[in-house]
């Protein structure tokens, strides 16, 4: 899109409060203070929630008069010169679509940031792994002496970076498909698309529509970092410098070397340019899928001028993120792994495929929750690598019907207790739900914490 003509903007409509919406208000307040001509601009905020997150701060910035506690109508959007939408807002709604048809600019916070920032930026998107990769790049960069910031769908809201007195040396953005829908000016040193699996099918009509939203990350990217195992998700043509990663070997790009370690066959090392740069046993992360995440992270580090050898030294110390294949207990020879962040089929498939080769015993999977319109038949081949399946939540029965002998239980607590009665030395219990959590929990963190507490209680009570 063309650059926003702030001097011609008299009326701004903000759709949605929350963390993003409040950061937009802070940004607009700052612009008003910097440019007296903007002091008279009318700003209205719409949010249909009775008590949306950030309401009190929004009142302090804007006052009560222009905080409107209802859903926006066509007359609201058509009255604006500029519409700023939070990521959760469906841009296919009639009041938004008709405003766009009337040539009213519709942007998100990332587009506002892109139009103003002159910082070096790399970005990550994908159905799964993007948070781990973002934090991994941030960790490595800081270990190598760079002042960097992680922002976007993780860390601080992007617009807050523009308000800081000291700007970082570089920015690492995690971007969701929702955020990318309204981005068109983001210039990146490198962009990575980790993977695509069916997700948010309650928002997108087709998988192709979801893929196209993800591919927008490459619009102005110099280096394109892409997954060799998912070439059907690559944008065509590839117009940037190509760097690939994958779970196979490659003579020039990043890849995996297979072999045998501790009696388990499979990938044992990360390679680059035909040489081993990192052994699997040097990492503190669980699962083969994390060896793939490391490859993408190293490629992004190269784009912000971090030497590969220095990056490899640093990444060995990265401990991973909570609720992502997190080992919460190794007790009596049984491993309990919290992968509550697995809110879609692809994430659960990655966890099972990544962890299965690392155990000598049986794999017991706990799955279920809110499926968000997913077709769970895509999980069928993954479930063939599972020995015992316990299901929970609203869509648990839909997963359970794919597995002979599965058992549906009422709660996660009951699932943990039942799992404890079934496992033996050498087994792993994996919570990887393939579903959202909001039928029984506040969020995936709440679900993961509940799993951890239930597991801890098992061994406290047996001590």
Curated annotation (Swiss-Prot):
GO cellular component: cytoplasm
Protein location: Cytoplasm
Record-linked Gene3D superfamilies: Mur ligase, C-terminal domain, Mur-like, catalytic domain, NAD(P)-binding Rossmann-like Domain
SUPFAM superfamilies: MurCD N-terminal domain, MurD-like peptide ligases, catalytic domain, MurD-like peptide ligases, peptide-binding domain
A Pfam entry, by short name: Mur_ligase_C
Molecular-function annotations in GO: ATP binding; UDP-N-acetylmuramoylalanine-D-glutamate ligase activity
Keyword list, A-Z: ATP-binding, Cell cycle, Cell division, Cell shape, Cell wall biogenesis/degradation, Cytoplasm, Ligase, Nucleotide-binding, Peptidoglycan synthesis
Ligand binding (ATP): 126-132
Recorded catalytic activity of this chain's protein: UDP-N-acetyl-alpha-D-muramoyl-L-alanine + D-glutamate + ATP = UDP-N-acetyl-alpha-D-muramoyl-L-alanyl-D-glutamate + ADP + phosphate + H(+)
Pathway entry: Cell wall biogenesis; peptidoglycan biosynthesis
Intrachain disulfide bonds: none
EC number(s) reported in the record: 6.3.2.9
Top-level taxon in the UniProt lineage: Bacteria
Family listed: Belongs to the MurCDEF family.
Protein name from the UniProt record: UDP-N-acetylmuramoylalanine--D-glutamate ligase
């Amino acid at each position: 899109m063309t650059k926003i003509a702030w001097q011609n903007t008299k009326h701004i409509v903000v759709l949605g409060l929350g963390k993003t919406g409040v950061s937009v208000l802070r940004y607009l307040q700052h612009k008003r203070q910097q440019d007296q001509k903007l002091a008279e601009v009318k700003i209205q905020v719409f949010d249909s929630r009775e008590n949306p997150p950030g309401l009190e701060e929004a009142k302090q910035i804007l006052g009560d008069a222009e905080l409107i506690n209802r859903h926006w109508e066509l007359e609201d959007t058509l009255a604006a010169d500029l519409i700023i939408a939070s990521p959760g807002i469906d841009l296919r709604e009639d009041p938004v679509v008709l405003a766009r048809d009337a040539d009213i600019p519709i942007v998100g916070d990332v587009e506002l940031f892109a139009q103003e920032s002159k910082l070096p930026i790399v970005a990550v998107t994908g159905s799964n792994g993007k948070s781990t990769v973002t934090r991994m790049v941030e960790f490595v960069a800081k270990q190598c002496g760079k002042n960097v910031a992680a922002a976007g769908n993780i860390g601080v809201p992007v617009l807050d970076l523009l308000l800081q007195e000291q700007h970082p040396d570089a920015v690492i953005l995690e971007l969701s498909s929702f955020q990318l829908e309204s981005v068109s000016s983001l210039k990146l040193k490198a962009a990575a698309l980790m993977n695509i699996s069916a997700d948010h099918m309650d928002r997108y009509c087709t998988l192709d529509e979801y893929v196209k939203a993800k591919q927008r990350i490459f619009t102005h990217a110099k280096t394109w970092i892409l997954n060799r195992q998912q070439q059907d998700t690559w944008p065509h043509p590839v117009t940037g410098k190509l760097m690939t990663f994958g779970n196979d070997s490659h003579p020039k790009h990043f890849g995996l070397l297979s072999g045998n370690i501790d009696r388990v066959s499979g990938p044992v090392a990360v390679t680059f340019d035909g040489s081993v740069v990192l052994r699997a046993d040097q990492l503190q992360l669980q699962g083969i899928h994390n060896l793939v995440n490391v490859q993408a992270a190293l490629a992004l580090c190269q784009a912000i001028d971090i030497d590969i050898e220095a990056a490899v030294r640093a990444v060995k110390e990265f401990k991973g993120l909570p609720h992502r294949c997190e080992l919460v207990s190794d007790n009596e020879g049984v491993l309990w792994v919290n992968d509550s962040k697995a809110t879609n089929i692809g994430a659960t498939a990655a966890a099972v495929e990544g962890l299965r080769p690392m155990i000598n015993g049986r794999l017991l999977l706990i799955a279920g929750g809110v499926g968000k319109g997913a077709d769970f038949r895509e999980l069928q081949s993954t479930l063939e690598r599972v020995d015992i399946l316990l299901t929970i939540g609203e869509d648990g029965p839909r997963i359970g019907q794919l597995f002979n002998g599965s058992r549906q239980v009422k709660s996660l607590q009951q699932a943990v207790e039942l799992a404890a009665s079934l496992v033996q030395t050498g087994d792993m219990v994996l919570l990887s739900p393939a579903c959202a959590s909001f039928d029984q929990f506040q969020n995936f963190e709440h679900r993961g914490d509940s799993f951890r507490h239930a597991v801890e209680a098992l061994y406290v009570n047996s001590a």
